[in-house]
Amino acid sequence: MRFVGIDIAAETHVLAVVDDTGTVLVKPTSFTEDAAGYDRLLTVLGAPADTLVALEATGHYWKNLFATLAARGFAIALLNPLRTRRFAQEDLERTKTDTIDALGIARFAAQKRPAPARLPDPATEELRELVRLRDRLVQDFGDRVRQLHRLVDLGFPEFTRYVRSLDSELATAILHDYPTAAAFQGVSVARLARLRYDGRHTVGPDLARQLVEAAKVSVGRHHGEAYRIQVRFACEDLDLLRRRLRALTGDIERLLRQHEVGTLLTSIDGIGPQTAARLVAELGDPAQFRDAAALAAYVGVIPATRQSGKHRATRAGLTPIGHAALRAALWMPTLTAVRKNPWLRAYYERLRARGKLPKVALVAAMRKLLIAVYAVAKHRRPFVPHLVPQETRA
């Protein structure tokens, strides 16, 4: 059996090959991230029989290489870089060089025999890319809202007394045309009242009058052109991001309708299209896990609470180990599912009746929701309570 270790970089990779005993069969050899480099790699490796290729899952650089090797029939394992670094340190290879990493990865594979991985199907990969793009847009949107808050606090701090949400279309429409308190000078109430902010609604006379009067006595009136430009740019960015998020949400939902598991997950009350897409993006097929408990452990939702004497833990059931982003994404769907799913609501209420704190009971409900996710994926059927393990139902 041959074990190939490949250290991944942006432009040049390094490979090394060892046998079952760790004896070096191919000394560390570099190859480039292009067609010529891949040809060199395949020439060195030869036939894929009795060969395990091990790669560190570093950023996105491994994906083209993985696809090329998989198409040639190689078994490929994706490794956590932290595990390979720890292995190298234990092997007294403490000097960080690409050559040592390639050999260390190969020897790690020879000793640990990691299971081969596989790329997700194209539909899952597309959902994953779009969900993560949406995450970035949401982050950008939040950044712009925070920037706008800072600017409004300086240029027209009284504005948020009348328009609470600066991320709303109402706020960005007004602030784009009237970015600071000084910009309201000479503006009539009637003109401001006619301003449309979503194609249908107008500001209205009451709000217009309040803003015009507040601007006259605002403590931010001294701010000038620099603030006006920044506010306008922030509003334009928010409008653009809002349109992109709407379009992207529609794209994700259309893709989800073509995804078998993703569509089935929406049959669970509380799991809408965006949550189902998130589950598919982060988990692939939930049925790939050994059982529902393994899925819950991967997410980082544990079944028991820690108690000592009279102390009752308020964060029981959550562990820092696991998928924090997925846990956060499941919080609101769990609240919805507790309201809409009779079996989950009964389970939650039973825990509360036993004296469990609301947060502890909700974490337990999240775990049961994940068990339902696993059952739907495993049976490839829409959600029905009797397919969920007995412990999940009240």
Residue ranges of predicted features:
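A detector of single, family-specific signature residues
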Residues: 1-394
